């Protein structure tokens, strides 16, 4: 499956997962023109609608795509929020140019995986920012995949 993000694209495979450009946003996904904010984090259903499955772009790019099924906690890099997710817990804190987002593995596990970003193409996230994206596997289990951006626009899986 793939997500359209601003002028660039973002693709992901849920089984093990990897991110790369290019791709397109399928009709099954929700396309948003603004980054998710804590006020839109609604825990009204197990899907956590409108929350995190985000294409992280440079600060000038404000369009993000969300995958309803694999959404977890909404927490963009410039905000602070925390709380229970039902499948575990997650928290994230803004640290300016060292911002970090932590996401639950989703199955009750307390473990986390992190993504270490370099500065290539991510000017607002260039000082050691770390992100983790949960993947929903066909087996019904959650798996967290970590990625590292590479100069030249491709994303490769980062072994945690």
Curated annotation (Swiss-Prot):
Coiled coil: none
GO CC term, one of those recorded: intermediate filament
Annotated keywords: Keratin, Repeat
Source organism, top-level taxon: Eukaryota
Residue stretches of each Sequence repeat: 41-50, 51-60, 61-70, 77-86
Cited InterPro entries: KRTAP_PMG
Positions of region (4 X 10 AA approximate repeats): 41-86
Function of the protein: In the hair cortex, hair keratin intermediate filaments are embedded in an interfilamentous matrix, consisting of hair keratin-associated proteins (KRTAP), which are essential for the formation of a rigid and resistant hair shaft through their extensive disulfide bond cross-linking with abundant cysteine residues of hair keratins. The matrix proteins include the high-sulfur and high-glycine-tyrosine keratins.
Subunit relationships: Interacts with hair keratins.
Family: Belongs to the PMG family.
The protein's name: Keratin-associated protein 13-4
UniProt gene name: KRTAP13-4
């Amino acid at each position: 499956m793939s997500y359209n993000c601003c002028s660039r694209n973002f693709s992901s495979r849920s089984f093990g997962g990897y991110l790369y450009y290019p791709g397109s946003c399928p009709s099954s996904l929700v396309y948003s023109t603004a980054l998710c904010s804590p006020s839109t984090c609604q825990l009204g259903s197990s899907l956590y609608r409108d929350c995190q499955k985000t294409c992280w772009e440079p600060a000038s790019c404000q369009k993000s795509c969300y995958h309803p099924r694999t959404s977890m906690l909404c927490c963009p890099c410039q905000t602070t929020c925390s709380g229970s997710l039902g499948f575990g817990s997650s928290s994230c804190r803004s640290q300016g140019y060292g911002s970090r987002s932590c996401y639950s593995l989703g199955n009750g596990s307390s473990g986390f995986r992190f993504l270490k970003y370099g500065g290539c193409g991510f000017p607002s996230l260039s000082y050691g920012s770390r992100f983790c994206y949960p993947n929903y596997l066909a087996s019904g289990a959650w798996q967290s995949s970590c990625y590292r951006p590479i100069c030249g626009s491709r994303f490769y899986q980062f072994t945690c």
